Structures are given as structure tokens and as C-alpha cells.
């Protein structure tokens, strides 16, 4: 039936029942049907008519299909759904875990190569573990890995509480952290200090990632 929306009250009415903001509904992404409450779900599979069409495509296509994946879980799902490899693994996405981002921020705030390498060495086990798990899921399929690409300002603390936590851990002032964060800000980050430029300025980052990649494969 038709859905009657009331944006002011943040509610809609369907099939004689009114749903309010926060109520749980379930939507079938294939049919578009809406169901009341939370219904049991299953993982998507390549089956039925869709599966048959995909079999036809596989029979005649010449173009290989790879996917973006940055975690072992995403890699496993990609292979399950027929990907022939990983077209792009964006390693910067591997660092946003709370413990990882904290050590990465310490590296960014460090003023010497030795200090940067000290904190980067703490990240190697995480990188190595992720790559090893992804290799296992790929079972010999190819993977293109992109080293840390974004400008470093994307990793810096955003709140005063985060800045204070970082300052306390490194034995520096909050003002020092704020100064570094301000200095890292870029007007046009898409064309700025990123990618290969970042690797030229801080080769120790690329060395850490290269080591993790190779050791995971051994």
C-alpha cells in the first residue's frame, strides 16, 4: 500500500499502522517490501535468476572483476561473492582502530626518525596480521596494496580530549599538539602532501608497510 509520511511528527503510516522515529522495520532490498519489526535474515548468496545470469556472464566475459577490500572480513566476503582478487587495499583504513590510531598519532607528533620508527614498529604486528589473514582468504589471488595515501591531518586528533590524551602520553603540552595539527592542515588536500610525496618525506612509513607486507607472505 501507499506510505503516508509526516515529516513534522517524524512518522509514517503504512497498511493502517503508524510507525514513529526509532521503531524497527525490515526492508527487503530485492522486492522493496517493508515488514514490521526485525525479521530473521540470511547472508546474500548468488542464486536463483540472478545466479543464472551471472553464470552466463562468466561464460562469455573477458573482463576480470576485483573489489576494494581493506580487512580480512571484507576480503572473505568479496571472494565468497565471486571477486577474482582485490583491486585496491587502502591501508589507511587499517589504522582507525583506537589503539592503532593512537600509536599512529604518536608517530605523527614525533620530531625524529628514531621516534617515528619506534611508534611505527608498534604498528607492524597489526599490519602484518591483517595482510596475513587477507592472503589466507585470497588463496593465491592477486591484491593491489596502496600504502598510506591521505595527508597526515586526516589522522590527527579532532577533539580537545583526544589532544590532551595524546599530549599526556607523549609528555608534551596540548598547545604543542594543537600547533602540529594546525601546521598539518591543507587547503587542497586532494593535491597536497599525500601518496608518494608522503613516502618521500617519511620513508620510514613506507619501510614499515613494506616489511609488514613481505613478512606476512613468508
Where are these regions (language model features)?
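Short, compositionally biased
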Residues: 35-53
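Short beta->alpha connector loops at strand-helix junctions that form conserved
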Residues: 1-2, 89
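Conserved alpha/beta-domain cores
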Residues: 46-49, 56-218
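A structural-propensity feature for long, helix-poor, extended segments
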Residues: 2-36, 112-114, 119
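Surface loops and adjacent helix of pleckstrin homology
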Residues: 30, 37-39, 148, 157
